[in-house]
Amino acid sequence: MGVWKKLTFLLLSLLLLVGLGQPLWPAATALALRWFLGDPTCFVLLGLAFLGRPWISSWIPHWLSLAAAALTLSLLPPRPPPELRWLHKDVAFAFKLLFYGLNLRRRLNRHPPELFVDALEQQAQARPDQVALVCTGSEGCSITNRELNAKACQAAWALKAKLKEATIQEDKGATAILVLPSKSISALSVFLGLAKLGCPVAWINPHSRGMPLLHSVQSSGASVLIVDPDLQENLEEVLPKLLAENIRCFYLGHSSPTPGVEALGAALDAAPSDPVPAKLRANIKWKSPAIFIYTSGTTGLPKPAILSHERVIQMSNVLSFCGRTADDVVYNVLPLYHSMGLVLGVLGCLQLGATCVLAPKFSASRYWAECRQYSVTVVLYVGEVLRYLCNVPGQPEDKKHTVRFALGNGLRADVWENFQQRFGPIQIWELYGSTEGNVGLMNYVGHCGAVGKTSCFIRMLTPLELVQFDIETAEPVRDKQGFCIPVETGKPGLLLTKIRKNQPFLGYRGSQDETKRKLVANVRQVGDLYYNTGDVLALDQEGFFYFRDRLGDTFRWKGENVSTREVEGVLSILDFLEEVNVYGVTVPGCEGKVGMAAVKLAPGKTFDGQKLYQHVRSWLPAYATPHFIRIQDSLEITNTYKLVKSQLAREGFDVGVIADPLYILDNKAETFRSLMPDVYQAVCEGTWKL
């Protein structure tokens, strides 16, 4: 019988005693003797009690209570279960989670349901003059709640007039937005205006171009694309195909240098700022798509993950759940095309009524100066952000700031400790989750290095499993009955989260094949259904989760998910490469994995490092660019004609192990140069910058 089963049986026995009118103090005394005094002291006291029974027999309770005390001693483990250390916080968190869930359901059950854009209108009435958004940088500006709501209303009326009502309804198509971070406030005004009309919005990575950009727009089902004028070249590369599919394109500016593309600026300025009636979005349900955020998933090009209005409100309430208030100032250096930057950051501040400070890009040298300038109290991060801050040489004013809380994901334990030692006792709440996932984890006790915490209470609300997996196929291992095999405590396992009515998995827009690939059936019993996160975690005895690795083709580098198939598609365009296999490799001292490609040269061709460098710099964002190239005579495949990546990833880029020619990305020389032992040593020691 397990510890928790014993404790449950003991609790039922004690409840029976209460029902029979018997005292519980003997059982409580037994518990105190065993757990708080230890076994030696416990048995000494019991021996003394036995010797002194003639003197204490007059107040010995009924034999049932004595039996309960004996049962308590026999069932109790020698020490309290580790989980009980955090029992008070587990109970408080579970009640808080239940309260927020019931409140969310109440809001969504209204007719029409209360949507995330309603928070803007509420803040515009309650706190009209409070600053909602601040954009830092050379073109720094700010906007109040009243002004932001007025601009959103102008955008709604302008787009309604431009596009006609049939074009902007939820069941007819989305609107895609492609903007640089410097245009954040303008883009957010348009985004909120579209939300007032009930139109879902797809946020596209502004680094996308060519085929990935075209695929992103098409897969979202967008009938409209709004583009930053500074991304003119990106748009014009794919414009003919967009126009051929009747996708209307607009520049978020006052002029258009491109035939076939209109400018929105004048229409936005001329539109009225009258309130937008809620009836225009009356057809929206809480399960309706609100936002599409692109994710690499485990395979293929970026896919638009569906964030319903329910999910957006859940995520945007995280700051409130963490105890933040309208008096907080949140510093956000994360991109708006990520759920952390847009939903938890911007929309989270709108829900709170707090001020969100948007930095166009992360700068370790300016980070704390801007935090001081804007009196920031909360910072959002991915693990790399805090590591970069710790890598900057120490300054006397490192602890002179008003930041008291940090929220994010991907923070290593060593960086966590270093960050708090250097910059002060900043409370850190680490999160775990994926954009398309149906369940998230939260380290609500601030335990260093953990990505989340669970308990028996949380498991009832959010069932999940850690199961054994095949590292080659990246699939769960099954037992003889066909069910998944749970891992032991402390062992790494593939995280699966149960799909239920109140925790649905909406998947991706478009083909259902991509969505079905993320589903795992018959995990614990016949007929159940789980979401495969593709992540490997470990669970310790106290209920803390620790991130171990990512499965499948996707790896994480510099805070971004990198799809190997997307990179393979870009590299395969080169005429001197016949076959390409991209994978992630570990680099000492670095978080995540950096890209590496094993390639087979086309017959009669030679490797051209300069041409490859120019190609990847033109077609791939920096985080997706492979840093190492390995030339092989042939690429190994499985029986099902899939490229073998695991062995290559294990071998990495070690020049002492690999006999094949190896090359490394050299940004100074703008080429891929031969990887020599001295350069390999520099990479391992951290003196060669990746």
UniProtKB/Swiss-Prot annotation:
EC number: 6.2.1.7, 6.2.1.3, 6.2.1.-
Residues holding AMP: F292, I293, Y294, T295, S296, G297, T298, T299, G300, L301, P302, K303
Cellular component, GO, one term: protein-containing complex
Cell compartments where the protein resides: Endoplasmic reticulum membrane; Microsome; Cell membrane
Gene Ontology biological-process entries: bile acid biosynthetic process; bile acid metabolic process; establishment of localization in cell; fatty acid transport; ketone body biosynthetic process; long-chain fatty acid import across plasma membrane; long-chain fatty acid import into cell; long-chain fatty acid metabolic process
Pfam families: AMP-binding (PF00501), AMP-binding_C (PF13193)
Domain of life according to the entry: Eukaryota
Catalytic reaction(s) noted: a fatty acid(in) = a fatty acid(out); cholate + ATP + CoA = choloyl-CoA + AMP + diphosphate; (25R)-3alpha,7alpha,12alpha-trihydroxy-5beta-cholestan-26-oate + ATP + CoA = (25R)-3alpha,7alpha,12alpha-trihydroxy-5beta-cholestan-26-oyl-CoA + AMP + diphosphate; chenodeoxycholate + ATP + CoA = chenodeoxycholoyl-CoA + AMP + diphosphate
Tissues/organs with expression: Predominantly expressed in liver (at protein level).
Molecular function GO terms recorded: ATP binding; cholate-CoA ligase activity; fatty acid transmembrane transporter activity; long-chain fatty acid transmembrane transporter activity; long-chain fatty acid-CoA ligase activity; protein-containing complex binding; very long-chain fatty acid-CoA ligase activity
Stored SUPFAM superfamilies: Acetyl-CoA synthetase-like (SSF56801)
Bilayer-crossing regions: 31-51, 56-76
Enzyme class: ligase
Keywords, ordered alphabetically: ATP-binding, Cell membrane, Endoplasmic reticulum, Fatty acid metabolism, Ligase, Lipid metabolism, Lipid transport, Membrane, Microsome, Nucleotide-binding, Transmembrane, Transmembrane helix, Transport
Cytoplasmic side: 1-30, 77-690
Keyword ATP-binding tagged: yes
Sections of the chain in a coiled coil: none
InterPro entries associated with the record: AMP-bd_C, AMP-bd_C_sf, AMP-binding_CS, AMP-dep_synth/lig_dom, ANL_N_sf
Regulation: Inhibited by mono-unsaturated fatty acids, palmitoleic acid and oleic acid and nonionic detergents, triton X-100 and polyethylene glycol hexadecyl ether (Brij 58).
Membrane topology label: Multi-pass membrane protein
Function: Mediates the import of long-chain fatty acids (LCFA) by facilitating their transport across cell membranes. Also catalyzes the ATP-dependent formation of fatty acyl-CoA using LCFA and very-long-chain fatty acids (VLCFA) as substrates. Mainly functions as a bile acyl-CoA synthetase catalyzing the activation of bile acids via formation of bile acid CoA thioesters which is necessary for their subsequent conjugation with glycine or taurine. In particular, catalyzes the activation of the primary bile acid, chenodeoxycholic acid.
Family, per entry: Belongs to the ATP-dependent AMP-binding enzyme family.
Protein's name according to its UniProt entry: Long-chain fatty acid transport protein 5
Organism of origin: Rattus norvegicus (Rat)
